């Protein structure tokens, strides 16, 4: 590492960015069951199990409401075709509540497989690191005291931007992970609405929303891969320009690429909704 304070500041900012990018890849490819040693998952499954009892009670309530609204009289309920239809609906709704956790984890496993396929197809097992070009390091180290004064301001502003973007991006990824926990914990309540025809849209909306949260992981990985390709081909540095101009041009282009990545990560939910019509 260079002894120059300006170079160290830029390299430290890029190091934090690379650390957060690597952390994103680790989180995206990790199962909620193994996250933080599985302690959070054990709490979530306990809550899910406790809410199943409430889900069964709501199952009966929504089933009765559905029967009352779809059947004009008790005589219609006694008809074989109506009775079979109601029985099948009740059985499916009960099965969805009982095995809801397994179904949700199976769907998440499918999405994790899609993410792994995307990463392997693109040839990115890990995130590509962003490195400060040697031309800029040499230009900064050759600057005198007065020439380096503008560089202090440029590197401080640029480093601060990189720090902020790093934490905004990782917070968005953690937010998606915590949404998976919340959906899993509360699942028995919305799934119980499948028991009644008038309330089944609530359950459908829940499953669509959960599918969207899972698919956000694939969008985030795609955004990281695109950024990694940008990072692997560093911006062209004009060696004839002054050191301040070189650094300002490099930081400006770097922050622009980072803003695109952070924006894509933060808007992953919106992109999924627009693509899948959720």
Regions found by a protein language model. Give the residues of each.
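Alpha-helical transmembrane segments and their helix-start/interface "positive-inside/aromatic belt" motifs
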Residues: 1-10, 80-100, 203-213, 268
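Alpha-helical membrane-interface segments at transmembrane helix boundaries
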Residues: 44-52, 84-88, 92, 141, ...
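Alpha-helical transmembrane segments
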Residues: 191-208, 240, 271-275
């Amino acid at each position: 590492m260079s002894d120059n304070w300006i170079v160290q500041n830029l390299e430290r900012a890029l190091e934090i960015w690379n650390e957060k990018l690597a952390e994103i890849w680790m989180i995206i490819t990790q199962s909620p069951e193994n996250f933080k040693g599985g302690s959070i998952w054990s709490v979530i499954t306990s809550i899910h199990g406790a809410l199943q009892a409430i889900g069964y009670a709501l199952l009966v309530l929504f089933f009765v409401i559905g029967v009352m609204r779809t059947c004009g009289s008790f005589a219609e309920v006694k008809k074989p075709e109506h009775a079979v239809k109601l029985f099948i609906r009740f059985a499916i709704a009960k099965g969805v509540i009982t095995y809801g956790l397994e179904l949700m984890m199976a769907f998440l496993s499918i999405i994790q497989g899609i993410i792994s396929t995307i990463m392997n197809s693109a040839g990115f097992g890990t995130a590509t690191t962003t490195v400060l070009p040697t031309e800029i390091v040499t230009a900064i180290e050759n600057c005198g005291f007065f020439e380096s004064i503008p560089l202090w301001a440029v590197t401080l502003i640029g480093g601060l931007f990189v720090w902020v973007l790093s934490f905004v991006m990782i917070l968005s990824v953690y937010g998606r992970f915590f949404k998976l926990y919340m959906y899993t914990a509360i699942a028995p309540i919305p799934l119980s609405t499948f028991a009644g025809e008038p309330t089944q849209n609530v359950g459908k909306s829940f499953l669509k929303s959960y599918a969207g949260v899972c698919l956000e992981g694939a969008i985030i990985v795609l955004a990281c891969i695109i950024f990694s390709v940008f990072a692997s081909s560093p911006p062209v540095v004009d060696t004839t320009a002054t050191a301040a101009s070189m650094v300002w041009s490099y930081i400006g282009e770097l922050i622009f690429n980072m803003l695109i990545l952070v924006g894509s990560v933060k808007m992953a939910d919106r992109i999924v909704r627009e693509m899948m019509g959720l």
